[in-house]
Amino acid sequence: MSESDTDPDIDDDAHNNGDNDVDVAVDESESAETTTDTDTASANAKLFGEWDVSEIEYEDPSTQRYITVTPIAHTMGRHAAKQFEKSKISVVERLINRLMQTEDNTGHKQKTMNIVEDAFDTIHNRTEENPVQVLVRGVENAAPREETVRLKYGGISVPQAVDVAPQRRVDQALKFIADGTQRGSYKSAQSAADSLAQVIIGAANYDVQSYAVGQKEESERVAEAAR
């Protein structure tokens, strides 16, 4: 065989390799497009199909890390068995779970989600703001900075003021909001959704007449007296 002759097997291999390179390039392009579409869909997702959570602003830097906002209102208890993982759950779902701890709503996740969804509609109608933003501001305002613990000295129990950890501050704020909702709607003509909206708006405006803010002020007042 002369040097000018080419091996047909080599030509076939080169041709096949070229086809493989094209296939790989096409697959990578399709994968990149799929990833981009998924990211875009995630960015455009809205809570309850209505409320944008991508531009929520925080005023309290100490609790910002523990007030998570996502467009997902139900994660199927994914973090239930992991300590401190609750801070990765959306604050809206945590509020829903808190409301479920009352007697009538225990275990009724869909019912409680409907209450929160209706409350958000009411908040938007009254304030013309994003209700998720109003909730975040309400949680920040209702989170106590000080509370008391009881220490025993020689058999005597003495109250002592302590600073509240940021994660517990958020826990307490959600508890106050849920308790205020239950108190406002129990044996009352006011619905749970209206009661919840009223408590959240009051907390967001730092209204001392609001149950959540009142409980926060009471906790800090008792702690100040125990210093």
Swiss-Prot record:
Acidic residues bias spans: 1-12, 20-31
Q: Which CDD domains match?
A: uS7_Eukaryote (cd14867)
This protein's GO CC annotations: small ribosomal subunit
> Which sequence ranges form a coiled-coil region, renumbered to this chain?
none
Q: Which GO terms describe its biological process?
A: translation
Q: Which UniProt keywords apply?
A: Ribonucleoprotein, Ribosomal protein, RNA-binding, rRNA-binding
Disulfide bond annotation, renumbered to this chain: none
Q: Where is the composition biased (Low complexity)?
A: 32-43
Q: Which GO terms describe its molecular function?
A: rRNA binding; structural constituent of ribosome
Where is the segment annotated Disordered? 1-43
What family does this belong to? Answer: Belongs to the universal ribosomal protein uS7 family.
User: What is the protein's known function?
Assistant: One of the primary rRNA binding proteins, it binds directly to 16S rRNA where it nucleates assembly of the head domain of the 30S subunit. Is located at the subunit interface close to the decoding center.
| Descriptive protein name | Small ribosomal subunit protein uS7
Q: Which organism is it from?
A: Haloquadratum walsbyi (strain DSM 16790 / HBSQ001)
User: Which lineage ranks, top first, belong to the organism behind this chain?
Assistant: Archaea, Methanobacteriati, Methanobacteriota, Stenosarchaea group, Halobacteria
Corresponding gene? rps7
